[in-house]
């Protein structure tokens, strides 16, 4: 039985009472699966009587989640689940859209795609120097292809077969899943290398994340503090967790690391990963010498989402919303891109006076309310609270990249480029060793590495403006020596709609990356004997997401997964099977 005092238990239950007004998961909050018979998920074996701790814990879970943990529907392994079609509201919003991947060969192709995307106001999901993913309406496809050179008119492949269904399945189910071996919502005080908690079995709305953060701060007051970064445009609090053990009366500036996510509202995996890393450090302090040392030497600021308004909007209205929700000069095009509004090398001219652009950085530097709030908080901490920010991890998705400054241009060479690249390589290696996920490493401008003698001046044009990024502002204006943007899973099979089974694996990968960062920051000043590798989190079978291998080419639900009737015949690709074509594997991917 867990070693809790009666006072602690009562305090937890009292806290649960204060937050019992959290909305339950219902259609009022986001699209939910239809109600399912409880018997469908009933246990086949009789259950042993629940112990005192389990009953008390379940009481808290019921108050927090609105449903008993026994009714939670576990989704793992090869178990089959009932199939529910996306509701009419999602069909109406997304059924006419498609996500296309274009393979790039020349700079002229990129330039043509950039110009066409700007003309048609298209939503660029992700881009590398090899491919670009674009979401657009099916009836706009002919117009787009007509603006492109012939080499691109057939160099594309659909990424997601059924966008409304994939959007629908990214929301949590109303039939919650059972806990694993009695584990529940509350953090465990027992030592365990496996972070298993129902909080990470699904993506969570802001109405759950906020109380969860308060609960952590109340349970671990010795090294966790709930703080506020500021307020959003719509008046929501921007909460954060400060994790660390600062020595009393220490005159030296407190070295601090910021780990943030959710600048772009639809990138849910970044939000969940910030929470996962915070939870792992918080619950392991005092049980692990390396982690205890890390939290005694540094403070960590965890900001799950700097864009709470946009995040709420993705749960309540539009799952694929990117920007914040502030007003612009065009009432029908609200929102500013919070990663294009920072004051360093802000390039508002790149999007002109077009608030409808997905990368619109506002009409002036720091036009984005939430970015301005974070910048003000950082300045206040530095000038008034003796804080020195030494590292910044900005979590995004997708494309699996570790990016370092500069983003706005490839021409300036960061003064500590070799160290930036060395640490970035270590981060990518830690991720690869966790689950064999390959992350590329480069400057954010995708220009050059430290091993090159000079900048490549013939790099491809950028698909969108790269000025005004948080990455560059923290590095240049704040003096954060180790500033990175991590673009998390995946490489395009699901894009921003990454299935929930990836939450824990991605969290473990980034936690291990933070361990590498910590080791690097501590250096060799008396910390050589710490066994960092022993703290790495490993994946078990339950963590491994089910990946479509493309071996099943059968039609499902009476639909042809290769239906391309919306593509004009003259633009269709006749090369159905090219082993050297990246798109072939995506075309073969089984429909979800």
Curated annotation (Swiss-Prot):
Disulfide bonds join 333-356. SMART domains: Zn_pept. It is found in: Vacuole; Secreted. One of its GO terms (biological process) is cell wall organization. Residues 22-174 form a propeptide. Binds 1 zinc ion per subunit. Zn(2+) binds at residues 264, 267, 396. Residues 170-179 have a biased composition (Polar residues). Residues 170-191, 542-592 are annotated as: Disordered. Glycans are attached at residue 349. PANTHER family: INACTIVE METALLOCARBOXYPEPTIDASE ECM14, PROTEASE FAMILY M14 CARBOXYPEPTIDASE A,B. This is Inactive metallocarboxypeptidase ECM14. It comes from Blastomyces gilchristii (strain SLH14081) (Blastomyces dermatitidis). The gene is ECM14.
